Swiss-Prot record:
Organism of provenance: Mycoplasmoides gallisepticum (strain R(low / passage 15 / clone 2)) (Mycoplasma gallisepticum)
Protein's recorded name: Large ribosomal subunit protein uL2
Chain intervals for the UniProt region annotation (Disordered): 37-59, 219-283
A cellular component term, taken from the record's GO annotations: large ribosomal subunit
Described function: One of the primary rRNA binding proteins. Required for association of the 30S and 50S subunits to form the 70S ribosome, for tRNA binding and peptide bond formation. It has been suggested to have peptidyltransferase activity; this is somewhat controversial. Makes several contacts with the 16S rRNA in the 70S ribosome.
Keyword Transmembrane: no
Gene name for this UniProt entry: rplB
Length: 283
């Protein structure tokens, strides 16, 4: 997908801005009204009004697009891609598809799909074609997949962002699981009846985007981040001191005093640990 670098730099704020030329890919259709829902902003606050997630607030108004992550309601029915649209709630694009029976839904757009293409979802083996959805056991080794379920029937949870994918490595010795190599290089087992979509998630050039100025970040609903070393000691463990002082501890800390950076956070007692063959950071 072509990226668009700003040539007419009217001010220094957009001197390094790089954006995506959406006109080459997206259609101009208005969103399907029946598949929109209200999205309330919480600005990172909980029900008591306390900040639980920092750096959230403001930004443009959004409506939530209801995405079909399960793709199991209309098995073996051909669906026609009607439009490819921008979704402000995610980095990948979404496609409006219309089934033979008139039902419409949004799905994540696979890379390379176009308006007028046909996609199918099934619980059985079907053509290995970009956009088709089926259980992992029917997809051959080496195939790139995205929109992957972790629990059969729950809906996709893995490889949903722009350019994300996993590679099928084959069945394990029991024949009950399929081994997948995720984008993080982690190798993990998935139940063979978990569904996945063939192909790579759309908008693969998303990682090349440079926002260029602080105002664009604010439009996204992200507020500024203040360095801990610029705070007072009562606000952050890194705060205080004369001038530019070092951390003064054995390791960097979070604002709440816990060790930060390079600390393992996964609980090895989780039952799913036995499904991980190789951790993402193992050599």
């Amino acid at each position: 997908m072509p990226v668009k670098k700003i040539v007419n730099r009217s001010n220094s704020g957009i001197h390094h801005k790089i954006s995506i030329d959406y006109s080459k890919v997206l259609t101009t259709n208005t969103p399907q009204k029946s598949l929109l829902a209200k999205k309330k902003k919480n600005s990172g606050r909980n029900n008591q009004g306390k900040i639980t997630v920092r750096h959230r607030g403001g930004g443009s108004k959004r409506k939530y697009r209801i995405i079909d992550f399960k793709r199991n309601l209309h098995d073996d029915k051909i669906a026609l891609v009607k439009s490819i649209e921008y979704d402000p709630n995610r980095s990948a694009f979404i496609s409006l598809i219309a089934y033979e029976n008139g039902y419409r839904s949004y799905i994540l757009t696979p890379q390379g799909i176009k308006v007028g293409d046909k996609v199918v979802s099934s619980s059985q083996a079907i053509d290995i074609k970009v956009g088709n959805c089926m259980p992992l056991e029917f997809i051959p080794e080496g195939t790139m997949v995205h929109n992957i379920e972790m629990t059969p029937g729950k809906g996709a949870q893995i490889a949903r962002s722009a350019g994300a994918y996993a590679q099928i490595l084959g069945k394990d010795d029991t024949g009950k699981y399929i081994n997948l190599k995720l984008g993080s290089k982690e190798v993990r087992k998935f139940l063979k009846n978990c569904r996945a979509v063939v192909g790579i998630a759309s908008n693969v050039d998303h990682n090349l985007v440079l926002l260029g100025k602080a105002g664009t970040t604010r439009h996204k609903g992200i507020r500024p981040t203040v360095r801990g070393s610029a705070m007072n000691p009562n606000d952050h463990p890194h705060g205080g001191g004369e001038g530019r002082s070092p951390v003064g501890r054995d390791a960097p800390r979070t604002p709440w005093g816990k060790r930060h950076m390079g600390v393992k956070t996964r609980n090895n007692k989780k039952s799913s640990t036995q499904l991980i063959i190789r951790r993402r950071n193992s050599k």
